[in-house]
Amino acid sequence: MGKAKFERNKPHVNIGTIGHVDHGKTTLTAAITITLAKTGGATAKNYADIDAAPEEKARGITINTAHVEYETPARHYAHVDCPGHADYVKNMITGAAQMDGAILVCSAADGPMPQTREHILLARQVGVPALVVFLNKVDMVDDEELLELVEMEVRELLSSYNFPGDDIPIIKGSALAAVEDRNPEIGQDRILELMKAVDEYIPTPERPLDKPFLMPVEDVFSISGRGTVVTGRVEQGIVKVGEEIEIVGIRPTVKTTCTGVEMFRKLLDQGQAGDNIGALLRGVDREGVERGQVLCKPGSITPHTLFEAEAYILTKEEGGRHTPFFTNYRPQFYFRTTDVTGIVKLPEDKEMVLPGDNVKMDVELINPIAMDKGLRFAIREGGRTVGAGVVSEIKK
């Protein structure tokens, strides 16, 4: 399917519902589809359809995720909802379901709970750019002052994790009322208000095509009389023949020129996001570039060895470790196309990490890797995946 374009006249945005168990994430997801179905913007789905989330694998980890899609007059959305807390943790850390924004669901009757906190923290750590809040189950709270108190608490919580708590839209309503098509003043009217807030407040993501050129190196060939060809899938941006590019990671950064782009044995004048290409590099010998490096627009990404990460460690049942690990644990970190050994340093208050935990940790790699905040990786021991992580901060 080389160049088939996905025809769509509206901007596409990936979102999801997050929040504490039983606060109404799945009911809200159903409510959105049922409400938007009235104007032809969705196929109505009930709670049971969404709750029976199929299993999928991402970076060797099994995750249950339900996907629904719908549209507003302004945008097309792909929406993810997970049945269990562990699925959320895994989903957000592996980036299995990319989130350009999220709807934080919080029960007005209970206020913020432990997983409300944890999901906000995860959203911050994995780089979810914006949140909108749905304060659910308002029909279970008779006291207007109590409602205001919960709203204040949610705003303070968001601010404490460096989200703009004072500015984030908070919509109050009842997802169940919308699903049952009653009390529109707290039901479907509020769902429409929520979607308007999502349309306006969650920024349209930059398309991969508009980002600076980046291609992870998968293979390197030498073609006699022509030079060195590097193959891989262009992750983002465009590379044009004749442009200067950099080779970054593992060894010192090298500048070169792309003198040719091949795809399916045809010569092209450029390669773009999504293309599997061979890039011909000027003046680079076969030994000068290796799998695990990236080709990129000069200056757009830099190599690093020390970073903070948020990681999820697989349980024994998921095929992970059977025992905990401690500071100075030395697994391999699989970035894009290659493994690099790294040393783990745990936070002061964390003596050990048990299988099934998610944890913040510092990692020092023995070789530098081209990285940005938000880069995903797998944690492996002898080729077996034992965890997944995301770069939350670059330190060196």
UniProtKB/Swiss-Prot annotation:
Positions bound to GTP: 19-26, 81-85, 136-139
EC class: hydrolase
EC numbers, comma separated: 3.6.5.3
Database matches in SUPFAM superfamilies: EF-Tu/eEF-1alpha/eIF2-gamma C-terminal domain, P-loop containing nucleoside triphosphate hydrolases, Translation proteins
Residues covered by the tr-type G domain: 10-206
Family per record: Belongs to the TRAFAC class translation factor GTPase superfamily. Classic translation factor GTPase family. EF-Tu/EF-1A subfamily.
Protein name (Swiss-Prot/TrEMBL): Elongation factor Tu 2
Organism, as annotated: Hyphomonas neptunium (strain ATCC 15444)
Taxonomic placement: Bacteria, Pseudomonadati, Pseudomonadota, Alphaproteobacteria, Hyphomonadales
